[in-house]
Amino acid sequence: MATESTPSEIIERERKKLLEILQHDPDSILDTLTSRRLISEEEYETLENVTDLLKKSRKLLILVQKKGEATCQHFLKCLFSTFPQSAAICGLRHEVLKHENTVPPQSMGASSNSEDAFSPGIKQPEAPEITVFFSEKEHLDLETSEFFRDKKTSYRETALSARKNEKEYDTPEVTLSYSVEKVGCEVPATITYIKDGQRYEELDDSLYLGKEEYLGSVDTPEDAEATVEEEVYDDPEHVGYDGEEDFENSETTEFSGEEPSYEGSETSLSLEEEQEKSIEERKKVFKDVLLCLNMDRSRKVLPDFVKQFSLDRGCKWTPESPGDLAWNFLMKVQARDVTARDSILSHKVLDEDSKEDLLAGVENLEIRDIQTINPLDVLCATMLCSDSSLQRQVMSNMYQCQFALPLLLPDAENNKSILMLGAMKDIVKKQSTQFSGGPTEDTEKFLTLMKMPVISFVRLGYCSFSKSRILNTLLSPAQLKLHKIFLHQDLPLLVLPRQISDGLVEITWCFPDSDDRKENPFFQKPVALANLRGNLESFWTQFGFLMEVSSAVFFFTDCLGEKEWDLLMFLGEAAIERCYFVLSSQARESEEAQIFQRILNLKPAQLLFWERGDAGDRRKNMEGLQAALQEVMFSSCLRCVSVEDMAALARELGIQVDEDFENTQRIQVSSGENMAGTAEGEGQQRHSQLKSSSKSQALMPIQEPGTQCELSQNLQNLYGTPVFRPVLENSWLFPTRIGGNFNHVSLKASWVMGRPFGSEQRPKWFHPLPFQNAGAQGRGKSFGIQSFHPQIFYSGERFMKFSRVARGCHSNGTFGRLPRPICQHVQACPERPQMMGTLERSRAVASKIGHSYSLDSQPARAVGKPWPQQACTRVTELTEATGKLIRTSHIGKPHPQSFQPAAATQKLRPASQQGVQMKTQGGASNPALQIGSHPMCKSSQFKSDQSNPSTVKHSQPKPFHSVPSQPKSSQTKSCQSQPSQTKPSPCKSTQPKPSQPWPPQSKPSQPRPPQPKSSSTNPSQAKAHHSKAGQKRGGKH
């Protein structure tokens, strides 16, 4: 029956009528769909470039059908609201409205595809939350949302039930009942006041809907009722710029199709369902792309395969099917052909007939033609399906071709992101060094170990100009041809938008002594440039990673509206100082941009306007951008990091590190060979090998303490906890919704707070509130990854009112402050709740610490954060009573020497690691500390270790800190004291020999382990000691 058709079937059946409607004004419906987030910015740009109205309309319908039934339903409603006459033409309004209960509506705060609480095309209130203040004797006015105040009390209207553990005062109950008619209707409303045990009712004329408001109510089912309860807040501290009061706990109104739901747990459940549904859709798209490319992730491509393929096909071979694209890319990259990526698109010249056939295939959803695959999708699929050895070769050759390299590779199949550290290990940078009084010599250094500032470029919302094209112009010499370091949207052929490569973070390095930079010496010292693909609102993890490691972040967007303000309310003052905004020329005269600059106190160089005109305008644009970059590079607050340094932070954020997986595979292979010792035909030989192996392991505590623990833990690691922490399990806490409350976030880089990044499980710019989502975390879920949209939760007005409070909290923070040894002082308070406390508790900690740090930095610092190498040495202490070790390969090998076999690294192994590895044999810890921890979460384990005073005393003897001026002797004592508690005899034989070299890596970890008597520590001594250690460590990397 026609009345039972799905929305996609309706579109298919009425395609001709819909095309006639769309042809009149396709741009209007296109703009509306984009504003409702039903189509992405890339899809909008692709359709915008199509000049033929009929083709544009046909492609739009196809795109909507591809996105599923929910999108089709919202598209039809959006179409009827934009073109009211379309409903009469098609006669479909009744049929469309019938599907409202079958297609889940995108409710406020729960949908990642729409920022509206109702259907598209409806005029919304100013914010997703309906906020009304009124005095005891005044009427409720929902139409104007006027603010009234009583001398003693103010009220807040919400649709969610009040928190059970909070007190309620004078809770009015407002019941709104209304009916929906075809043309217009009146909406009687009864306000029921419950006060002091008495009930009385008043009619409120202001609740009658106007004409525009009626259009917004047609999507609500008939006879629906919304019960609104209120909580009372009285917080004089939250005073905004406009002089109105703001409140810490803001809640939202949610309308369901049948019965209203007010439980925060149910809302969280719907968020989980949306998240899982989105993940499943991405997995399906990923599998489709791999199928199109004829690739299988379970069958890794090896370098020998590429060589054999090249020999069989020859140098003049051209791809003939989509399955040849990946091989074409690999062949040309291995040959260091700079057209490797271009060949993916320009392998075949299309004539007019071929173009028509291609368009017809797209319209029939046959989109797997070779021209339609985005080259970045091919790159990501190729890297994910390649063996680690091939990945290293591809990375090295891409670097030689001056291509941007994938730093964070999106893994859509597993909903993760991978730091490609191991794949970059073989990249070598040749440098010319001139010794005093001697000739110039060329030296080689691994690129992953070179420390330099990082500048990131991200897109916020819609941007009409190409960010990657601007970067190519910036990095290419003026008199030479523009080199495509980054692929951009101006591609020569018709391609689909990115399918699996959104969230990709690419990186390129600029060296002033390079041959291609000598003619355009813009950067006077080495710098790394990172580029995030896609809208940062959809990739919160990657954006947080870049905020941590970058010395400056450039935001590209057309204009600054509520959505942009909502995001920036999560940025602290020190983070804002590192942010630069590139806007379109239309935003120059806008009032929003002026308010934005005034409120955030942006310097002129932080707000750039990109003119789209002749060559003169383009030259002025580049000059302005270069001036901003010069300001960054000459800043005294530059933070220099290496790719190796980024690994610790990546693990904390739930980002996988590829070399961890490689080490685990290596362990499994070697362990499998040893454990299959009784195989037929090799039984005796295997048995003797295993026996000699166990004998050598028994002797290793005396001869090679570092190697023994490594081998013993390798076998246990095979059956222990997985190496990779899932993103949705024990992940750092994103802003989540709990009972209508949303956690406020302050994006603050870790060094702003006075210590290196990579300290804790949660990000350093995350500032949780007391009402943390314990339930969601208990279920191991997090909704921030690729789904968190701040604009859903906060309006621009809330940002204005919140800004002063948030920025006030960071007023003492200074970007680029040198690390301070706060962790030595915080350990005087060994007990600390699992979740971070309130701001008042943070102030209490601040008073104990005695440093002028911002409030946002206190919760993070209060953990007593281990420094990077300290975290490596401390993490193996946490063992269960059964002897099951929690260890990953990256913890035992945090330095470049870790590439070598264990037996060959005894002399190079830092002494601090040797002590820890011996410590794991005899030092037992509380098994309860294992709860909620993960092997990738170094800081989480360290934090748990601090919470037990006995553990602190057990792990660190008093003589350790009493002689800070003798690091070697104190370190020797630390190494000896740990195993002596259970195995005194091995301890005597493991004393370091005087002739054994002491690598500089071991020294920075000396003052970092927790001290039982840290309150008596002299801060100046500790600070000087840290500075000295930090300098020595910096020379190593």
UniProtKB/Swiss-Prot annotation:
N-acetylalanine, modified sites: A2
Pfam families reported in the protein's UniProt record: CARD, URGCP
Positions of the UniProt region annotated as Disordered: 235-270, 669-704, 887-1037
Cited PROSITE patterns: CARD
Regions of compositional bias (Pro residues) in chain numbering: 994-1012
UniProt cross-references to InterPro entries, sorted A to Z: Apoptosis_Repressor_CARD, CARD, DEATH-like_dom_sf
Phosphoserine found at: S154, S985
Keyword Acetylation set for record: yes
Organism domain of life: Eukaryota
Cross-referenced PANTHER family: CARD6/NUCLEOLAR PROTEIN 3 (PTHR22797), CASPASE RECRUITMENT DOMAIN-CONTAINING PROTEIN 6 (PTHR22797:SF36)
Entry protein name: Caspase recruitment domain-containing protein 6
